[in-house]
A protein has these predicted regions:
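Hydrophobic, well-ordered secondary-structure segments
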Residues: 5, 25-28, 48, 121-125, ...
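Short, aromatic-rich membrane-interface segments at the entry and exit
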Residues: 38-47
Length: 153
């Protein structure tokens, strides 16, 4: 949770160390493949380009946050008034995998990151919205679900 005044819930999606390490390894392998046979300054170019791109990509993905503020659920890519939400379900890793994969509905709104294994599924009860549910990645499904069930109060 964060320190935002008026926020009933706040969670940052900071990438864990293994994501940073994986990004560096992928960038190094790709750069090594591209620089094969190059000499001099041309051998350095793939590393100088791919390493910063990989790190900036992870940094950008880590900027996501879930917030419940002033009766509104805010996630990367969307926001919805809590009044339009119905049932709330906490999902463990296996349930999250199923809802993101074989049981996914095409119209569902999904906001998560690869390193967030758990999630909260929230039914949408807005008559003007054909989205059946929101799937929100979180490290603390119980805490987020409790806030959503209490409608952010």
């Amino acid at each position: 949770m964060g320190s935002t005044v008026g926020a009933a819930y706040e969670e940052r999606w900071t990438a864990p160390p293994w994501v940073w390490a994986a990004a560096v390894v992928v960038a190094l392998v790709a750069a090594a493949t591209l620089h094969s046979g190059a000499d001099g300054a041309r051998a350095v170019v793939p590393y100088a380009v791919l390493l910063p791109v990989a790190l900036l990509t992870v940094l950008r993905a880590s900027r996501g946050r879930v917030r419940v503020v002033d009766g509104v659920l805010q996630v990367p890519g969307g926001r919805i008034a809590l009044d339009h939400l119905g049932g709330v379900r906490e999902l463990d890793r296996e349930a999250t995998r199923r809802v993101r994969g074989p049981l996914a509905q095409p119209r569902a709104f999904v906001s998560t990151r690869a390193w967030l294994g758990e999630a909260v599924q929230v039914q949408v009860e807005d008559p003007d919205d054909d989205t059946p549910y929101w799937l929100i990645g979180t490290r603390a499904p119980a805490a987020l679900a409790d806030v959503l069930r209490s409608r952010g109060r």
